Amino acid sequence: MESWLTSLITQSLTFSILIVGIVSFLESLALVGLLLPGIVFMATLGTFIGNGKLPFYPSWIAGIIGCLLGDWCSYFIGLYFKNWLYSLKFLKKNCHLLDKTKSLLHKHSMITILVGRFIGPTRPLIPMVSGMLKLPLKKFILPSLLGCILWPPIYFFPGIITGITINIPPNPKNDYFKWLLLIIAILIWFGIWLTSKWWKIKKIKNKNNIHFIKRNIGWIALIILSSGIIGLILIQFHPTMIIVRKVFSTIL
């Protein structure tokens, strides 16, 4: 996938920015976004930003535009094609996810739209369900806009760091630093993933074995995430971080 994106991105700057917008649009589009690995695509684009093949700010703007178009198309698809959507096999099989999304939108519409932007399965669903529920536009516009402003750089960030570290001049100290950075990134992402799993299990009541799993996953998630955060703080004192900061400042 990366080689395919590389060949497209090297064609021209305008074409490269267009790709960022298209990827952001498809990631946000109703149902289509469920089929795409958002973190993989956006992190790959972030790698190109990190190694200087893509400019950061034009990519960010393209990401915002693509994201907003995807959100608005999804909203109006839900608004005008509600009955057809209910007849889809996918939504029938995943009616629990649809019902849960509806419940969250009824209780906390603005927070759900904003937070849902950063969660893979709900990103392309929440705008569509908002339309299906005929959520007032004034409640949809602000969280959608804020989410679309924040989402691209956050999802670019792992790739940007990867792109920067790849281009660090090779020497034994730098190779050691790269492995440290990779381990820290894995710990943080795995800790976040485990925390999300723990949060879901936490809501399940009764059953003693569930209580045992819930308690243990919570502790494991806390230990792993804390280790990653501590590692991230400590690595700031590594000499190679000076190079990383300089390269990062040139990108921004």
From Swiss-Prot:
Keywords: Cell membrane, Membrane, Transmembrane, Transmembrane helix
GO cellular component term, pick one: plasma membrane
Cross-referenced InterPro entries: DedA-like, VTT_dom
Protein name from the UniProt record: Uncharacterized membrane protein BUsg_132
Cellular location(s): Cell membrane
Bilayer topology: Multi-pass membrane protein
Membrane-spanning ranges: 5-25, 29-49, 61-81, 141-161, 179-199, 217-237
Family, per entry: Belongs to the DedA family.
